[in-house]
Amino acid sequence: MPKRVLQGVVVSDKTDKTIVVKVERRFTHPVMKKTVRRSKNYHAHDEANAAKIGQTVFIEESRPYSKTKTWKLVEDQAAAAEAAGTAA
């Protein structure tokens, strides 16, 4: 089974090797038929302390690192865009 990958914005990077990522999802309310936005914060492992507040990042499911931390940082979009720009 493939690991889930989510995209979100870093809202906190205060703890060592941990970031908090806010992931927003949109869905149509079953009764009101209106598009609703809901967000959830995920704690993710950031081995290199690379992510900064405000960056858009991808996180993926992984083994439990602690009681609340079961996601890990895959890449941040700024670094991916920079790498693509230098490679071209």
UniProtKB/Swiss-Prot annotation:
Pfam families with a match to the protein in the record: Ribosomal_S17
Record-annotated membrane-spanning stretches: none
Keywords for this protein: Ribonucleoprotein, Ribosomal protein, RNA-binding, rRNA-binding
GO biological process: translation
UniProt-listed InterPro entries: NA-bd_OB-fold, Ribosomal_uS17, Ribosomal_uS17_bact/chlr
GO cellular component terms listed in the entry, alphabetical order: cytosolic small ribosomal subunit
GO-annotated molecular function: rRNA binding; structural constituent of ribosome
Top-level taxonomic group: Bacteria
Function: One of the primary rRNA binding proteins, it binds specifically to the 5'-end of 16S ribosomal RNA.
HAMAP family linked to this entry: Ribosomal_uS17_B (MF_01345_B)
Family membership: Belongs to the universal ribosomal protein uS17 family.
The protein's assembly and partners: Part of the 30S ribosomal subunit.
Name of the molecule in the record: Small ribosomal subunit protein uS17
Name of the coding gene: rpsQ
